[in-house]
């Protein structure tokens, strides 16, 4: 009851609201300090290029790859766990919660103009550890129509990391 009361107090402040421009865009530099962001870790540029390393996953190292148990924790698009879902026999990732495809690059998906392969022959990134890569907080820009290319070096993403969102309340 105490937690519910505290959540209600935050909602009644009228300061925060859900981000309306799409889940995937919420985790980009453009949406920093949006009305959904309650508490975040501020990314600060410095001459040493130090920062958080979420953008490194799109390069050769892929050191922050999501583990299989994280992938398997996504519920199905009907809002139920796989074993209770009408999509229980579904193979692949199409019937998972739509936030999955906006958060994770997975085998068979298209990213940076290429179909992600399971054999690690993609030129622009590898997925050697788990076969999956994070999209969230990854910085990229479209330099040519249909072609997305990273615009930052490793360990220097300028994107803040949201620790508490209004949706969490």
Task: Label the predicted regions.
Residues 1-124:
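An aromatic- and glycine-enriched ligand-binding surface/loop that stacks and positions planar moieties
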Residues 88-166:
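Flexible, polar/acidic helix-loop-strand segments at domain edges
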């Amino acid at each position: 009851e105490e937690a519910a009361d505290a959540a209600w107090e935050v909602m009644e402040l009228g300061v925060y609201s859900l981000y309306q421009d799409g889940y995937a865009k919420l985790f980009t530099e453009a949406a920093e300090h949006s009305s959904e962001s309650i508490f975040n870790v501020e990314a600060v540029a410095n001459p040493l290029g130090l920062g958080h390393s979420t953008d490194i996953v799109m390069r050769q190292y892929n050191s922050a790859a999501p583990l299989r148990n994280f992938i398997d924790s996504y519920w199905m698009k009907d809002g139920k766990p796989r074993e209770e879902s009408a999509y229980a026999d579904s193979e692949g990732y199409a019937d998972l919660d739509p936030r999955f495809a906006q958060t994770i690059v997975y085998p068979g998906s298209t990213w940076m103009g290429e179909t992600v392969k399971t054999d690690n022959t993609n030129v622009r990134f590898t997925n050697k550890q788990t076969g999956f890569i994070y999209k969230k907080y990854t910085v990229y820009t479209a330099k040519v129509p249909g072609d997305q290319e990273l615009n930052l070096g490793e360990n220097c993403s300028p994107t803040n990391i949201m620790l508490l969102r209004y949706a969490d309340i």
